UniProtKB/Swiss-Prot annotation:
It comes from the Eukaryota. The lineage of its organism: Eukaryota, Metazoa, Chordata, Craniata, Vertebrata. Its main location: cytoplasm. LRRC51 and TOMT were originally considered as alternative reading frames, LRTOMT1 and LRTOMT2 of the same LRTOMT gene in primates. It is found in: Cytoplasm. This is Leucine-rich repeat-containing protein 51. Residues 137-175 form the LRRCT domain.
Length: 192
């Protein structure tokens, strides 16, 4: 199967599902059997999964150390990963490793322990990110939570399982003008 055929078929493939496995560290995935669904996982000749979805929800992960290496061991084409579910873990930040998956379009991070709203800034480099969940994290309590995320990630179409409307975008832009100070352009006069 060539890469083009893989891209067309793997979206419909069942996810590589390690949810509800009490996994503490990413490296444990290598020795763990994924959950089985109604349809069997398709594998390459090398035994790696041909899916573009990785579900790690409802575990006890507190960091994503070695995520790239483990993804390479489990997936035939980790660079094509489009959906990662890390909901209901113990993550306290958005690990920069997630920003290396440029085909990522769905990212679930709800029900973790992410404190700082500024963590969302890391995700702005993901060109295909369309669906994001962050509710159930302490950051949700910060004033302007939804508006900040929508301003920072202007390409997302679904946030916290709700569609992003034109009214949401307008409200976010107004909020941005009222709350986020524009960066001053540095000029020689600033130093005088």
């Amino acid at each position: 199967m060539n890469k083009r055929d893989y891209m067309n078929t793997s979206v419909q493939e069942p996810p590589l599902d390690y949810s509800f496995r009490s996994i503490h560290v990413i490296q444990d995935l290598v020795n763990e059997e994924p959950r089985t669904g109604l349809r069997p996982l398709k594998r390459s000749k090398s035994g790696k999964s041909l899916t573009q979805s990785l579900w790690l929800n409802n575990n006890v992960l507190n960091d994503l150390r070695d995520f790239n290496q483990v993804a390479s061991q489990l997936l035939e084409h980790p660079e094509n990963l489009a959906w990662i579910d890390l909901s209901f873990n113990d993550l306290t930040s958005i690990d920069p490793v997630l920003t290396t998956f440029f085909n990522l379009s769905v990212l679930y991070l709800h029900g973790n322990s992410i404190q700082r709203l500024g963590e969302v800034n890391k995700l702005a480099v993901l060109p295909r990110l369309r669906s994001l969940t962050l509710h159930g994290n302490p950051m949700e309590e910060e004033k302007g939570y939804r508006q900040y995320v929508l301003c920072t990630l202007s390409r997302i179409t679904t946030f916290d399982f709700s569609g992003v409307t034109k009214a949401d975008r307008t409200t976010a832009e107004v909020w941005k003008r009222m709350n986020i100070k524009p960066k001053k352009a540095w000029t020689k006069q600033n130093t005088l």
